[in-house]
Amino acid sequence: MVSPVTVVKSEGPKLVPFFKATCVYFVLWLPSSSPSWVSALIKCLPIFCLWLFLLAHGLGFLLTHPSATRIFVGLVFSAIGDAFLIWQDQGYFVHGMLMFAVTHMLYASAFGMRPLGLRTGLLMVILSGLCYAFLYPNLTGAFTYVVGVYVAIIGFMGWRAMAGLQLVGAAWRWTELAAGTGALLFIVSDLTIALDKFCFPVPYSRALIMSTYYAAQMLIALSAVESREPVEDYRLSKAK
């Protein structure tokens, strides 16, 4: 088991470019009303840095750890989605949603299906259903279906990320903590986007959306550092 302190000490320096790029985004705070390739680059820069963070562990690491590879590819689709959302008012919002839907499926695949965590899954089904029920009266046209599918996909990703948190004590590894927290923050970010776009203006929505989004992506990238092993292995080791 790798402790959070050990991860911070070993991986913190590799994340310095990410933190700097994130600061650049918030300091420049380019107006969203004037989309440009410069604003797209500034928005995507922290995600590019997370690419480099994973690549810094070597191509061999990615090739021998399928979950890390899927998270890396998910970050690639995230950057494409970020670029599309810069021009969301010009008709590219659905394109961005599609890219992030692919991202969530890749992340869910990286998190795996063990342990199954049926209770966590049931909870996510209930929460996802409540979110969609709240959004539904404000959805029109294709968004009625597109948003429903997206909610189901991100809910599934959240389930797979948090399923490993069902045990306590030594079974809680950094991988599950980072993945679960990252997924939760991603859901908060996307829910804020949905509320602000379809329901009502959310105060300081952009700051809330981007801060939770960048934190989520960082934590999910960090979850790839320690190779994921089934939590059932912990039960077996305890039984011995």
UniProtKB/Swiss-Prot annotation:
Compartment(s) of residence: Endoplasmic reticulum membrane
Keywords, comma-separated and alphabetical: Endoplasmic reticulum, Hydrolase, Lipid metabolism, Membrane, Transmembrane, Transmembrane helix
GO biological process: lipid metabolic process
Tree of life domain: Eukaryota
EC number: 3.3.2.2
Entry GO MF terms: alkenylglycerophosphocholine hydrolase activity; hydrolase activity
Lipid bilayer topology: Multi-pass membrane protein
Regions of this protein lying in the Extracellular compartment: 43, 92, 137-138, 196-206
A Pfam family it matches: YhhN
Catalytic activity: a 1-O-(1Z-alkenyl)-sn-glycero-3-phosphocholine + H2O = a 2,3-saturated aldehyde + sn-glycerol 3-phosphocholine; a 1-O-(1Z-alkenyl)-sn-glycero-3-phosphoethanolamine + H2O = a 2,3-saturated aldehyde + sn-glycero-3-phosphoethanolamine
Main localisation: endoplasmic reticulum
GO cellular component: a single term: membrane
Residue intervals on the Cytoplasmic side: 1-21, 65-70, 114-115, 160-174, 228-240
Enzymatic class: hydrolase
Transmembrane domains' residue ranges: 22-42, 44-64, 71-91, 93-113, 116-136, 139-159, 175-195, 207-227
Family from the record: Belongs to the TMEM86 family.
Function in brief: Catalyzes the hydrolysis of the vinyl ether bond of choline or ethanolamine lysoplasmalogens, forming fatty aldehyde and glycerophosphocholine or glycerophosphoethanolamine, respectively and is specific for the sn-2-deacylated (lyso) form of plasmalogen. Plays an important role in lysoplasmalogen metabolism in the adipocyte tissue and macrophages.
Protein name: Lysoplasmalogenase TMEM86A
Encoding gene (name): TMEM86A
